[in-house]
Regions:
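Accessory, solvent-exposed terminal regions and/or long lumenal/extracellular loops of proteins
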Residues: 162-271
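Catalytic-domain carbohydrate-binding cleft regions of carbohydrate-active enzymes
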Residues: 1-164, 169-170
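Solvent-exposed, conformationally flexible loop/turn segments
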Residues: 126-128, 153, 267-276
Length: 276
């Protein structure tokens, strides 16, 4: 949950297969997060455009969105990822002891300082842990993993495992999710899922371009405005603005609510709405 995701290791291998194999907890946890990251590309790409074009901010201190809640004024262990996600990273090791390893900018890791374990230690990574999370006041929140809805202005205890961090969605959010891919442009975004979180009015602008060049600087891009009216329970997809070579002329969206209800919407660039 950062603007860019890179798994670097100066001279320490970081490939996923260095951490076990499929079916083992560490490997599976890494794979789960990589797949989640790729599914969020429509949200991430659109939010990046907000940063570029409208001077928005990606990783947002809570005070930026909830200035009236004094409890978040000096909070430094939670943040908003875009305007929909509240991220509460687990900042202390929950399964294995931490070890500080010195690094030298010339020679890399000090391997003698790193040391090695005296013996193999079995770690139960599936043992459930927990973390406390403050949900800002003034809005309702949804647990991203379970879709449980809860009111803001209180601290909750969230169960955590190796593959789950506390992650909440602000009521009124519209979150587009993309296909399961191995690389960013493997599949077209012709059937995105739009997760809508009721409880407040909300909006989102889906941004798209050719994805692999600078033609957007010449105006080659599109925006699709989306708006959720909470009182009427209606999602409206506005008329598409702009164009670029190879853009999808028609497509489908699957609109999904936290309670599991969903509806398919055909979209050809003209305003259309769906009611729940």
């Amino acid at each position: 949950f950062t603007p860019m995701m890179r798994s670097h290791g100066a001279d320490t291998p970081r490939e996923i297969y260095q951490f076990g194999k499929k079916g083992e907890p560490v490997y599976d946890a890494i794979e789960k997060m990589i797949r989640l990251r790729y599914s969020l590309l429509p949200y991430i790409y659109s939010t990046s455009w907000e940063v570029t074009h409208r001077q928005s901010t990606f990783m947002r201190a809570l005070v930026m969105d909830f200035p009236r809640d004094k409890k978040v004024w000096n909070m430094n262990d939670e943040y908003m990822f875009g305007k929909a996600f509240l991220v509460a990273p687990v900042l202390e090791a929950q399964y294995t002891p931490e070890k500080v390893v010195k690094v030298d900018e010339e020679s890399g890791w000090n391997r003698d300082n790193a040391g090695k374990a005296d013996e193999r230690v079995h770690v139960d990574f599936m043992q459930q842990k927990s973390a406390e999370v403050y949900l800002p006041a003034g809005t309702a929140w949804y647990d991203f993993w379970t879709n449980e809805k809860m009111e803001g202005g209180r601290t909750v205890t969230r169960a955590t495992t190796l593959d789950i961090i506390p992650l909440y969605i602000k009521a009124g959010s519209i979150v587009p999710l993309g296909p399961d891919v191995q690389y960013a442009t493997e599949k077209p975004w012709d059937n995105l899922t739009l997760r809508v979180y009721p409880g407040a009015d909300g909006s989102f602008v889906l941004y798209e371009d050719e994805f692999d060049n600078y033609n957007y600087e010449k105006g080659a891009y599109t925006e699709i405005p989306m708006a959720w009216d909470d009182s009427s329970r209606r999602l409206t997809l506005g008329a598409r603005k702009g164009e670029y070579k190879g853009m999808l002329q028609s497509r489908k969206f699957t609109v999904l609510l936290p309670d599991g209800r969903q509806k398919a919407v055909s979209y050809n660039g003209k305003k259309v709405s769906v009611k729940f």
